[in-house]
């Protein structure tokens, strides 16, 4: 009976677990895993191939080699199951136990585990508070360590050399205890009292003030507490028993010719066993100390190599000079256990083949070769054959399929019907890289792919291959059909625009059929409808392009969503009328009544989806494709050499440019311009010439002159094939046509600099040898770049996925009122992105009011769809506060309202959607399109940088924000604030343009004044920074002593003299401490106060400042007192493209970041040191001033006595995101990162929705540093998960206690991935050893919240359809129900019964 119970217990699967804990293994635990001790280094007998007894492959310890058969062959078959053979001692069971049964080795001397010793920071070193060097010297038998000092003057843990030890031994005898080797370290660890040590350290922490000491102490406290809380014992970091991996995980395979292939682990284990046995023997023989010591050291090294080869000293190599793969190497890296077997697996029921076009397929179909289908669906076919009674057994069915009998094909047809397959093209950069289709059987061996899904797969038909997978279970088929079918993935998850968009031939065909032509056959007819138009065209009575009137019936949706017909006569062409026949009801005719290019077609599909929904759009897309292909064939568009028309003016333009270049060369030789200026000018001249040539060429291609019906000449858009292809967006661009028929233009060298001699020829004329060489020179760089780019982009995607993988939508509404203000993106005079594009699909965080009133336009918590956005535009709303994932209050995951619309589906996001992964893919996927190049500012760009005025483009009124200004003597405004913005507002109050205005700019128009388009509203000198007085009065020089602090210089050309302030380095000793300044006094000589303060108006002058006033002159407010020359910013490289995106997400500090004000207050300068200035900010409220040392060469934007706000820029430069977070808060840093990333993508014309970047930013902000612990259990300065602090504070506040105060941290994506709560996820990402060591010591629990952890433990992921499963488990656990018990299968039951009966027959209880 006992056996029966045992059997039933063993049948229940123990799959139900909620978390995984990692901890140190105690020696007893290792013994409890083990099935026996491995005593011999032998593996298998090379003659009989049987495993040696007690060896590394011993059958007695690890289990039988053959199923249900003992080694000597006494017991065979199932009936002896569970018997232990008395001859060979092997249990009769399945051979797969050799994969799970472990053994152990009893070590003769303890050895340290290398991970806890050498993985930095060394855990053993930190725990004992001893330097790693010393511990290593003890472990590897170079010195002694004192364990008990006794009554002597020796300290515990003191290190003694051999001589010192012998001296001490003579002096004290056995009063004290000192040892060497791992035993000594073990004894030290064993005798530690962790709790008392903790108390002591906490006391020290409260007493000490030094920063470094505090850091060290907190580290130790954290480690000690981890040991106390996890129940790990410190001495377990020293191994006394070594576990042995099951033999089938370190196989030994006989090759032919009597050789063996073996896993490296066997070699490493053999060395350990050999040395261990030798040591045992030496100890038994009581060998001399020095020999034993050497053997112990060698054992330590052998164990080190087994655990992590190469971490200490040289790696042990095999016979072929390659380092052996240790246990640590088995789990880390791309080929390790995590990434090779747990996160990525090979799958059954899959095949791959080349793809070709399937233009006749429907959108949801793919062509599957019969051969492949037969192989993939074999089990289904066998099942069907048996079900029909066509085959009696599976074996017979197999035979039938092999013979390929006729009936098999009919059955294959049945099986395949309604059974979707998945198609995948590597690299799978986003979720549209795997889609489901219904297979259609075809002859041939290539998979046929629908042309419209090529864009999503990024596939072309030049030999690409794709893989097919068969979803087997019913659930999988359901998901494939409902979620992954290509017809359900019409919109791109990255930006919510259609991704199923016709391209190339289809676009050309539609463009051709919707073009109009002057005086075509049949012009001026009036037709009864599209049907008649098609009849006339087919019968050759009317041309496709003829301008005609057609009666068109449009359908419009009324308020109830019913379709209402409306008929009218339209001016159109025959082709457009024919195209109208396939447009679904409900769309306006205006949508096809134009020459349709790629953009127009995309817009048409988008409109169709938004108005009519999914099904009509899919049918429409298919119809568009068939029509496009048909008319592209009809058009007969082809490219001949005569289509490349070279403009006549080309030679004239080129000779003019050459003359200009010659002139500049002369100026250079006569020394009037520098080499750099000459180079820049030459490049400008050629760039301008190139533009002129290409303009002439395009004008030439674009139009042709024809005779119209009245016999007059008329210009019309040309039907030149090359022009049509470019104009429609089918293929090619103006730049490419320019190279064909204009001039090739300027070429770049591989380092990105431009070669100043352009290629004046084009491809039609042909290149000479020199030109050909120049053009290959730069082109090769492009190819090398592409290869690098792909790898880099893939790595960026991997890091992004890793940081965001556990972010899932977990609730509907977190109830927060927080959000971010959305305004249109305006750069200079252009609206780069209008407000509607930014808020579309977001949820409002607060009521949006009608501008100028208190009426609510859009209530809070409204999902802004297209209609709402139209309403916002009509009311010219300028800024909307929307919910954002960055400010979402959900603890684990985010809520649906903060995320908004699911871009790929068009409704609010569902719970369980894995938004983190979607965001990562959306940002990573276009990565390959970004440039790798970091571009230098060269040529035209550098002159544009030195702007000196603002000229507005539109008319409107001026609005200045954060501005301080004074009026000068001529009544103009002079700006005296730092980050002033000038906006142009149109009559509806919408911002049209926005400019930055520098300090000292003179405004022509004031705040709120009207300006006309093209008017200049502000001027300034770009090369100097003025010092402007805010008061009127008389100038009084202070500390300005000629020769000491200033020097007089006279300009040679004008003869005017000016004073120049000396740098402190140039001053004499007496002038070092003087501070030259200009004071403003009134006529009586009293100080004038700055208005609104009680500070006298005096302006301190920095070094190099130029003063053109004399002492005692009268000045008025707004005048320039002095000018500080600005060294031009040099050519700082702008990092662009992919590296810039990576820098932003890694939150790297820029080289010379902008210096921001840490607190608000008044600026003054303290005592200078040799190379630095001391900046002091004194708060107005009288709290402590803040000091900072700033290098002298940094240019400051502030003067003495100026008031700054916290977060203001003190010295220009690229801003460091950490500073923005610290000084301006979470929303500011979000805005900064989002805008910077978008700038890079916008340059490449890639559209990504802001919320994807916000999702990544949320993950970068997931840690917080504790500033003050309050009544919580956190340590001051500890970095913890933000959600944990929030939860802890909520509980504390509920109990009326003080919560912890914290500051948010910004981590780069790599750091953030490694700092996740889940150690499984972190270990599978990077630095596996370090992560696992840390986790084991702390005894971490992995709650399996993220996606990766669940994939690794082999569960459904808690997202998508798996979300419900996980919710259900949590609910059941909360209710305390038992998980559904797995049913025992019939065969298992019969087998176990047989086993029980056998055991009963054997009569002996082999326990």
Curated annotation (Swiss-Prot):
GO terms (BP aspect): DNA-templated transcription
GO molecular function, one term: zinc ion binding
Superkingdom of origin organism: Bacteria
Necessary cofactors: Mg(2+); Zn(2+)
Modified residues (N6-acetyllysine): 972
SMART domains: RPOLA_N
GO cellular component assignments: DNA-directed RNA polymerase complex
Binding site for Zn(2+) 1: 70, 72, 85, 88
Residues given in the record as Mg(2+) binding sites: 460, 462, 464
EC number of the protein: 2.7.7.6
Keywords: Acetylation, DNA-directed RNA polymerase, Magnesium, Metal-binding, Nucleotidyltransferase, Transcription, Transferase, Zinc
Catalysed reaction, written as an equation: RNA(n) + a ribonucleoside 5'-triphosphate = RNA(n+1) + diphosphate
Keyword Acetylation: yes
Cofactor notes: Binds 1 Mg(2+) ion per subunit.
Positions with a binding annotation for Zn(2+) 2: 814, 888, 895, 898
Reported function: DNA-dependent RNA polymerase catalyzes the transcription of DNA into RNA using the four ribonucleoside triphosphates as substrates.
Subunit structure: The RNAP catalytic core consists of 2 alpha, 1 beta, 1 beta' and 1 omega subunit. When a sigma factor is associated with the core the holoenzyme is formed, which can initiate transcription.
Protein name, as recorded: DNA-directed RNA polymerase subunit beta'
Organism of provenance: Shigella boydii serotype 18 (strain CDC 3083-94 / BS512)
């Amino acid at each position: 009976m006992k056996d029966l119970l045992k059997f039933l217990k063993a049948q229940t699967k123990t799959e139900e677990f909620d978390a995984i804990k990692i901890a140190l293994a105690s020696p007893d635990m290792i013994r409890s895993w083990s099935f026996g001790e491995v005593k011999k280094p032998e593996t298998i007998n090379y003659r009989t191939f049987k495993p040696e007894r007690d060896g590394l492959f011993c059958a007695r310890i690890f289990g039988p080699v053959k199923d249900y058969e003992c080694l000597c062959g006494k017991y065979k078959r199932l009936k002896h199951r569970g018997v232990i053979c008395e001859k060979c001692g092997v249990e009769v069971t399945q051979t797969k136990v050799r994969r799970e049964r472990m053994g152990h080795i009893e070590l003769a001397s303890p050895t340290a585990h290398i991970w806890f010793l050498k993985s930095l920071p060394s855990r053993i070193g930190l725990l004992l508070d001893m330097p790693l060097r010393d511990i290593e010297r003890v472990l590897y038998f170079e010195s002694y360590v004192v364990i008990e000092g006794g009554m002597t003057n020796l300290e515990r843990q003191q290190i003694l050399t051999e001589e010192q030890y012998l001296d001490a031994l003579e002096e004290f005898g056995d009063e004290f205890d000192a040892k060497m080797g791992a035993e000594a370290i073990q004894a030290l660890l064993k005798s530690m009292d962790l709790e008392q040590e903790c108390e002591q350290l906490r006391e020290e922490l409260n007493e000490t003030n030094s920063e470094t000491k505090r850091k060290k102490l907190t580290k130790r406290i954290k480690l000690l507490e981890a040991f106390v809380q996890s129940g790990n014992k410190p001495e377990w970091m020293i191994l006394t028993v070594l576990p042995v991996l099951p033999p089938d995980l370190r196989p030994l395979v006989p090759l032919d010719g009597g050789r063996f292939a073996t896993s490296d682990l066997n070699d490493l284990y053999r060395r350990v066993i050999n040395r261990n046995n030798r040591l045992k023997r030496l100890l038994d023989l009581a060998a001399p100390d020095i020999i034993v010591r050497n053997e112990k050291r060698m054992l330590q090294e052998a164990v080190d190599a087994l655990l992590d080869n190469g971490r200490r000293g040289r790696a042990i190599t095999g016979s072929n000079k390659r380092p052996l793969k240790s246990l640590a190497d088995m789990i880390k890296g791309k080929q390790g256990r995590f990434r090779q077997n747990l996160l990525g697996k090979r799958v059954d029921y899959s095949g791959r083949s080349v793809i070709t076009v399937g233009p006749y397929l429907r959108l949801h179909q793919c062509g599957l070769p019969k051969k492949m289908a037969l192989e993939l669906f074999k089990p289904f076919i066998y099942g069907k054959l048996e079900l029909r009674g066509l085959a009696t057994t599976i074996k017979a069915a197999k035979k039938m399929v092999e013979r390929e009998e006729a009936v098999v094909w009919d059955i294959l047809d049945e099986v395949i019907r309604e059974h979707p397959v998945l198609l995948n093209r590597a690299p799978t950069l986003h979720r549209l890289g795997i889609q489901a289709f219904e297979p259609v059987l075809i002859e041939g061996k290539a998979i046929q792919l629908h042309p419209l899904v090529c864009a999503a797969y990024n596939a072309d038909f030049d030999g690409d291959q794709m893989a097919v997978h068969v979803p087997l279970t019913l659930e999988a088929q359901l998901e494939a059909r409902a979620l992954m079918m290509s017809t359900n993935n019409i919109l791109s998850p990255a930006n919510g625009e259609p991704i199923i968009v016709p391209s190339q031939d289809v676009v050309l065909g539609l463009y051709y059929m919707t073009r109009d032509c002057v005086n075509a056959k049949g012009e001026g007819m009036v037709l009864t409808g599209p049907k008649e138009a098609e009849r006339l065209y087919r019968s050759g009575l009317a041309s496709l392009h003829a301008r005609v009137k057609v009666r068109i019936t449009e359908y419009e949706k009324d308020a109830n969503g019913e379709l209402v017909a409306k008929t009218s006569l339209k001016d159109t062409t025959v082709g457009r009328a024919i195209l109208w026949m396939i447009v679904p009801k409900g769309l306006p005719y205006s949508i096809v009544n134009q020459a349709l290019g790629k953009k127009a077609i995309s817009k048409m599909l988008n409109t169709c989806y938004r108005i009519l929904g999914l099904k009509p759009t899919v049918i429409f897309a298919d119809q568009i494709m068939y029509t496009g292909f048909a008319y592209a064939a009809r058009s007969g568009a082809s490219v001949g050499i005569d289509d490349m028309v070279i403009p006549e003016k080309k030679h004239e333009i080129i000779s003019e440019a050459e003359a200009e270049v010659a002139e500049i060369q002369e100026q250079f030789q006569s020394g009037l311009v520098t080499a750099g200026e000459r180079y820049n000018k030459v490049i400008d001249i050629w760039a301008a010439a190139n533009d002129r040539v290409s303009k002439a060429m395009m004008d030439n291609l674009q139009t042709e002159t024809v005779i119209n019906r009245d016999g007059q000449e008329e210009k019309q858009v040309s039907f030149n094939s090359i022009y049509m292809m470019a104009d429609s967006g089918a293929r090619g661009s103006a730049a490419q046509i320019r190279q064909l028929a204009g001039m090739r233009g300027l070429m770049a060298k591989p380092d990105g600099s431009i070669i100043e001699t352009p290629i004046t020829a084009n491809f039609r004329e042909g290149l000479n040898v020199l030109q050909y060489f120049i053009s290959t020179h730069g082109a090769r760089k492009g190819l090398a770049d592409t290869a690098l780019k792909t790898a880099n982009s893939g790595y960026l995607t991997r890091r992004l996925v890793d940081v965001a993988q556990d972010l899932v939508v977990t609730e509907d509404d977190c109830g927060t009122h927080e959000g971010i203000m959305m305004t249109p993106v305006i750069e200079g005079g252009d609206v780069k992105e209008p407000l509607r594009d930014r808020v579309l699909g977001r949820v409002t965080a607060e009521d949006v009011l009608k501008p100028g009133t208190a009426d609510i336009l859009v209530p809070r918590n409204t999902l802004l769809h297209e209609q709402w956005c139209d309403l916002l535009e009509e009311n010219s709303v300028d800024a909307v506060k929307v919910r954002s994932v960055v400010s979402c209050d959900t603890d684990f995951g985010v809520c649906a309202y903060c995320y908004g619309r699911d871009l790929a589906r068009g409704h609010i996001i569902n719970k369980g959607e894995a938004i983190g992964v979607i965001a990562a893919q959306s940002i990573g996927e276009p990565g390959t399109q970004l440039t790798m190049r970091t571009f230098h500012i060269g040529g035209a760009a550098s002159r544009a940088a030195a702007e000196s005025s603002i000229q507005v483009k539109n008319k409107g009124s001026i609005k200045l924000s954060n501005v301080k200004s004074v009026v000068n003597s001529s009544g103009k405004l002079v700006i005296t604030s730092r980050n002033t913005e000038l906006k142009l507002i149109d009559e509806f109050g919408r911002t049209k343009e926005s400019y930055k205005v520098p300090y000292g700019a003179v405004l022509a128009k004031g705040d709120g004044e009207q300006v006309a388009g093209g008017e200049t509203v502000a001027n300034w000198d770009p090369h100097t920074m003025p010092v402007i007085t805010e008061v009127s009065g008389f100038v009084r020089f202070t500390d300005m002593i000629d020769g000491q602090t200033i020097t007089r210089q006279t300009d040679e050309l004008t003869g005017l003299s000016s004073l120049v302030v000396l740098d402190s380095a140039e001053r004499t000793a007496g002038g070092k401490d003087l501070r030259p300044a200009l004071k403003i006094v009134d006529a009586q000589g009293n100080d004038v106060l700055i208005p609104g303060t009680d500070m006298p108006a005096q302006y301190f002058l920095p070094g190099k400042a130029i003063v053109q006033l004399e002492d005692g002159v009268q000045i008025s407010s707004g005048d320039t007192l002095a000018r500080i020359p600005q060294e031009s910013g040099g050519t700082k490289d702008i990092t662009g493209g992919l590296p810039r995106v990576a820098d932003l997400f890694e939150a790297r500090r820029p080289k010379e970041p902008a210096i921001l004000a840490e607190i608000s207050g008044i600026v003054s300068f303290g005592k200078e040191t040799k190379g630095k200035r001391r900046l002091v900010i004194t708060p107005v409220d009288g709290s402590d001033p803040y000091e900072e040392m700033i290098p002298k060469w940094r240019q400051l934007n502030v003067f003495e006595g100026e008031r700054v706000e916290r977060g203001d820029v003190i010295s220009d430069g690229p801003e460091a995101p950490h500073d923005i977070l610290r000084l301006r808060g979470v929303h500011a840093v979000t805005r900064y990162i989002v805008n910077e990333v978008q700038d890079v993508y916008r340059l490449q014309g890639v559209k990504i929705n802001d919320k994807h970047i916000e999702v990544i930013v949320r993950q970068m902000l997931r840690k917080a540093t504790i500033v003050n612990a309050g009544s919580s259990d956190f340590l001051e300065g500890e970095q913890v998960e933000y959600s944990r602090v929030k939860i802890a504070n909520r509980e504390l506040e509920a109990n009326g206690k003080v919560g912890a105060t914290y500051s948010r941290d910004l981590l780069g994506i790599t750091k953030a991935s490694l700092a996740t709560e889940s150690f499984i996820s972190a270990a599978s990402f990077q630095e596996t050893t370090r992560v696992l060591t840390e986790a084991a010591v702390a005894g971490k629990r992995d709650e399996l919240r993220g996606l990766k952890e669940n994939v690794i433990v082999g569960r459904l992921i808690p997202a998508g359809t798996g979300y419900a499963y996980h919710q259900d488990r949590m609910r059941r656990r909360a209710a305390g129900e038992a998980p559904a018990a797995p049913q025992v299968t019939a065969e298992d039951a019969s087998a176990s019964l047989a086993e029980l009966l056998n055991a009963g027959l054997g009569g002996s209880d082999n326990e």
